[in-house]
Amino acid sequence: MQAIVETVFDAVYLVSVITIGILMICGCKGNHQFKLFGLMAVVLGAGDSFHLIPRALALCTTGLENFTVPLGLGKWITSVTMTVFYVLLYYVWRERYRVKGNNGLTAAIYGLAAVRVILCMMPQNQWLSDGSPLSWGIYRNIPFALMGLLIIVLFYRSAKEHDDSAFRWMWMTIVLSFGFYIPVVLWANTVPMIGMLMIPKTCAYVWTVLIGYSAMKKECK
C-alpha cells in the first residue's frame, strides 16, 4: 500500500511542477521574473526525479535495499539541484522587487551555494553506500539552511514593504519546507517514520511553485 500511495504522490508531484514550470517559461510573455520562476520549477522537478524515480522503482519491485547506488546517486544530484533552486529563487526576489546592487548579499548566496556543492561532492558523504554518515548530512546542510534563512528573510521583508499580496506567503513555504526537512536529516536513519515528513515538505514546494504561477496568471494577461 505504501508503495502505491507514495509512487502516485511522487508521480503527480513531478508531473505537476515540471508542467507548471514549462507553462511559466512559455507563458511569461517576456517577463524575466516569471521565466526564472518557471526555470526554477523545472529544476526542482527534474532534480527530484533523479531520486524519486529510483525510489518508486525500488518500492514497486525488490525493495530499497537493492537500489542503494541509484538512490544514493539520485540524492547526490538532488542535493545540487536544490542548491541551484535557491540561487534561482534569490534572482526571482531581485527581479520582482527590482533590487539593484547588494553585491555583498549576492556574494553571500553564491558563497553558501559553492560551499554546499563542495561539501556535497566530498567522498565522506558515502552517497553510493548504505548508511551515509549523519555528521556529513549535517555539514552539507548547514550552508543550505543558511541560504534558506536568507531567502526567508528577504521575501518576508520585501513582501511586507511592498504590500505584495501575491507573494505574501512565499517566506512561509520556505519555512515549512525546511521545518519538515531538518528532522528528516537528523533522525530519519534512527526513526524511519520521520521520513514521512518529506510528503508535507514536498507539498510546501508545490505551494512555492503555485504562488509563482498564480502571480504570473494575474500579472501577465
Predicted regions and their residues:
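Terminal transmembrane helical module of multi-pass membrane proteins
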Residues: 171-217
